[in-house]
């Protein structure tokens, strides 16, 4: 005879306080995304899954979260059209049906993503890694379930400090004027690339995706890379290294500039997205001459962003 085990999660808590997010973090899965006439993409994503909890319930049914993730992954195993943000939306829908007491459900996914690129001069092909991110949030409103999904990426690049570069330039100008006239000195200043301290920049960009639209992860990665002083590359021969350093120092940017660059580029590329589309841009630069890092962030809607940019 089977033993009937108690379900203590449904008990009334001694302290009647509702909780914003309860769930599981760090759920790792193997995900194979089929592609028409191409090799499948193999990912090992990490999922975080949460629901809110009403004040009259002691706990959530925790096992239902990884259960929902596993069930959806099995369902999409042979689907060549599914995108990672749509996958997250499907998991949210599944969790909504399993947690009937929840008014809000959230799932986020992060995975390493490999993409190919060429070194700038020798054109050697190299495998590069970025973090691909996806998220979906579901709400119960007026008896209906509404789900909003997002896709994004986190990419490493290189940034060069404009302030230090101008200081070096001014210092070198004064030295040149000791033995050159002003006209010749100016020609040198216009020709030579000046030194500065640089950083390993980590750019993050996320955008909500409407139901009838698609945003490619590769496009997000490209926007992030182009918003810094220079992309970085795993394989650089001497000519590539020279070009990377020179190109970066010809495009110095503050951490604030990186965020603004990302926002401007994504607003122009997806200007026809709904006005309430939420966009998040974040940049953290690992300083070379300080022990601390520099950080900047903007969270906005497409409508607010277009109004600021007047587009």
UniProtKB/Swiss-Prot annotation:
Cofactor note: Binds 1 Fe(2+) ion per subunit.
Cofactor(s) recorded in Swiss-Prot or TrEMBL: Fe(2+)
Single GO term (MF): iron ion binding
UniProt keywords, alphabetically: Hydrolase, Iron, Metal-binding
Residues with site note (May be catalytically important): 161
Segments traversing the membrane: none
Pfam families: GCHY-1 (PF02649)
Swiss-Prot/TrEMBL GO biological process terms: tetrahydromethanopterin biosynthetic process
The organism's place on the tree of life at top rank: Archaea
Catalysis: reaction(s): GTP + H2O = 7,8-dihydroneopterin 2',3'-cyclic phosphate + formate + diphosphate + H(+)
Group of enzyme by EC: hydrolase
Pathway membership, UniProt: Cofactor biosynthesis; 5,6,7,8-tetrahydromethanopterin biosynthesis
EC number: 3.5.4.39
Record NCBIfam families: GTP cyclohydrolase MptA (TIGR00294)
Quaternary organization: Homodimer.
Function summary: Converts GTP to 7,8-dihydro-D-neopterin 2',3'-cyclic phosphate, the first intermediate in the biosynthesis of coenzyme methanopterin.
Family note: Belongs to the GTP cyclohydrolase IV family.
Protein name listed in UniProt: GTP cyclohydrolase MptA
Organism this protein belongs to: Methanobrevibacter smithii (strain ATCC 35061 / DSM 861 / OCM 144 / PS)
Name of the gene: mptA
């Amino acid at each position: 005879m089977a033993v009937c085990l108690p379900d203590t999660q449904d008990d009334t808590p001694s302290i009647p306080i509702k909780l914003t997010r309860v769930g599981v973090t760090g759920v790792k899965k193997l995900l194979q995304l089929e592609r028409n006439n191409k090799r499948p993409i193999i990912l090992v994503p990490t999922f975080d899954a949460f629901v809110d909890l009403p004040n009259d319930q002691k706990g959530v049914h925790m096992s239902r979260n990884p259960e929902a993730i596993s069930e959806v992954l099995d369902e999409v195993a042979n689907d060549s059209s599914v995108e990672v943000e749509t996958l997250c939306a499907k998991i949210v829908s599944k969790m909504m049906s399993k947690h009937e007491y929840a008014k809000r459900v959230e799932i986020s996914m992060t995975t390493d993503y490999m993409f190919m690129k060429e070194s700038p001069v020798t054109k050697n092909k190299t495998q590069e890694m970025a973090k691909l991110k996806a998220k979906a949030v579901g709400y119960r409103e007026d008896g209906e379930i509404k789900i909003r999904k997002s896709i994004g990426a986190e990419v490493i690049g290189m940034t060069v400090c404009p302030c230090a570069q101008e200081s070096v330039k001014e210092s070198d100008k004064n030295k040149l004027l000791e033995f050159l006239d002003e006209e010749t000195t100016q020609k040198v200043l216009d020709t030579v690339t000046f030194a500065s301290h640089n950083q390993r920049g980590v750019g993050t960009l996320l955008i909500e995706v409407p139901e009838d639209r698609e945003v490619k992860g590769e496009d997000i990665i490209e926007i992030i890379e182009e918003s810094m002083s220079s992309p970085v590359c795993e394989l650089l021969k001497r000519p590539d290294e020279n070009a990377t350093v020179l190109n970066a120092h010809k495009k110095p940017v503050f951490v604030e500039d990186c965020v603004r660059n990302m926002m401007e580029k994504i607003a122009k590329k997806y200007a026809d997205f709904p006005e309430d589309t939420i966009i998040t841009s974040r940049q953290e630069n690992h300083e070379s001459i300080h022990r601390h890092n520099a950080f900047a962030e903007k969270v906005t809607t497409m409508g607010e962003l277009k109004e600021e940019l007047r587009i």
